[in-house]
Amino acid sequence: KVLNKETAPKAHRPERIIQFGEGNFLRAFVDWIIYNMNQKTDFDSSVVVVQPIDKGMVDMLNTQDDLYHVNLQGLDKGEMVNSLTMIDVISRALNPYTQNDEFMKLAEQPEMRFVISNTTEAGIAFDPTCKLEDAPASSYPGKLTQLLYHRFKTFNGDKTKGLIIFPCELIFLNGHKLKETIYQYIELWNLGEEFKTWFEEACGVYATLVDRIVPGFPRKDIAAIKEKLQYDDNLVVQAEIFHLWVIEAPQEIAKEFPADKAGLNVLFVPSEAPYHERKVTLLNGPHTVLSPVAYLSGVNIVRDACQHEVIGKYVHKVMFDELMETLNLPKDELEKFANDVLERFNNPFVDHAVTSI
């Protein structure tokens, strides 16, 4: 049957999150995290999705009343998992290129608190051709500055109406880059010292590091999945079980975003840098170590390399005896992360080609 709010129950929750991006990653990572927070804590929030470019999936989302399923596949502490969960956190999805008034009105909603984005690595960029009166500005930071300025004016600079901003773009210190770009727009558009002070004191832009492999729409399994669900869901998104979100922000922000109370792997830390280094060393490092050896041995899939009698032992030894020694984080934390990495490499559902590394 069709998937919409008539055929599937959908809770009505306050709109507190604006999300720039409607792609597979945000829907299988951030929206899945918010779903779990709604289920297990008093977070009680829904998401308004904003399509960051003029072409996207907003119409498809709205056709299904913004409902879709996440299919998690992989090993969890050695156990095989293949689960399907209906995600109901998106209240509506907007295209600012055709619905700019509705987009700007989001700034007028007093209960709005968070902005989350994934607009690709190229998304956080300054475009000097953007104008304040553009409907909307072409760049993501331009749109965000328009929204923030409208909120500032709507609430007469009320410091309690600031927004907490979590960029998820795959750029090291993405929050710093986004903040820098917003300052460039404040200057370009002459938005004034009062607004600049409000932005600095009432809002927070925090660097984050995201980690979850999201293969996306399960083309080869979709018929079986629809049969199992009994819904015609054209927005199913597949992801691995492992998830990690490191947010460089103070603990009072963690209180407002209580992911830890939902048992999620979301960390609020004073510095993202050691976690970035850990990921590069213990995830990308072993990939680099195993790929030439596996390739020359005629082993084509990462999982098969890890299960190979010689290559598997070699990778394990390099990870635990050499790479780990270079990192300045608690040993038990590093060992857990390394074991999670090996479990991810062994995921029976993901055929990760050695040559793609």
Positions of PLM-derived features:
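Substrate/ligand-engaging "lid" and interaction regions
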Residues: 1-357
